[in-house]
């Protein structure tokens, strides 16, 4: 229960992150109801799942959803990664990104470092300019709150997908 209150307090302190989440897929993405059912089997969903975001399908592997948590000067969102979905390698130029794990099991990796697991209640701040990726563990659901300070001139540069064999080899 303390984790729930802490996460609600953190979310209330920030606003929506306009994260680009999507995927290239052969079939329609799962419905919000289907994603809700899947999450109930992996610690449940504390925050809304939001809507499927196909705006940047070229920058994610697998399906993901984005839910705005508040409005204001600092963007904050809950991002739901469906069964192994994850971002491609990318860099946030001019601003850092903080990820707060909410449910399921995920990973992040900063280029040149080993992948690190993210579990509910854990957080990481990715430094500005650090090439990285983040998302669900192979075959598992994952949700995180993403927070980025809005900085004039900040932008995201996208790179290639994470190596599929290396990703699938994660424990």
Summary of predicted features, one role per range:
Residues 25-75, 88, 155-171:
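A short, N-terminal "cap"/entry segment at the start of jelly-roll beta-barrel domains
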Residues 75-92:
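Conserved short histidine dyad/triad with adjacent acidic residue
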Residues 107, 128-155:
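Ligand-binding loop in jelly-roll beta-barrel domains
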Residues 94-107, 111-112:
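Glycine- and acidic-residue-biased ligand/ion/polar-headgroup-sensing regions
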Residues 87-96, 130-136:
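Histidine-centered catalytic micro-motifs
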Residues 112-129:
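Short acidic-glycine-tyrosine-enriched beta hairpin
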């Amino acid at each position: 229960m303390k984790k729930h209150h802490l996460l609600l307090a953190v979310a209330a302190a920030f606003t929506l992150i306009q994260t680009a989440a999507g995927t290239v897929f052969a079939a329609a993405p799962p419905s919000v109801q289907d994603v809700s059912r899947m999450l109930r089997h992996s610690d449940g969903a504390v925050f809304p799942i939001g809507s499927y975001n196909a705006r940047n399908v070229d920058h994610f592997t697998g399906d993901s959803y984005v839910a705005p948590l508040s409005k204001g000067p600092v963007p904050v969102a809950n991002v739901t990664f469906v069964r192994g979905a994850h971002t491609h390698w990318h860099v946030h130029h001019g601003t850092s990104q903080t990820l707060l794990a909410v449910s399921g099991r995920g990973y992040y990796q900063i280029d040149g470092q080993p992948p690190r697991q993210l579990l509910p209640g854990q957080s990481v701040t990715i430094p500005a300019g650090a090439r990285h990726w983040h998302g669900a563990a192979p075959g598992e659901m994952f949700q995180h709150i993403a927070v980025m300070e809005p900085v004039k001139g900040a932008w995201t540069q996208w790179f290639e997908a994470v190596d599929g064999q290396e990703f699938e080899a994660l424990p």
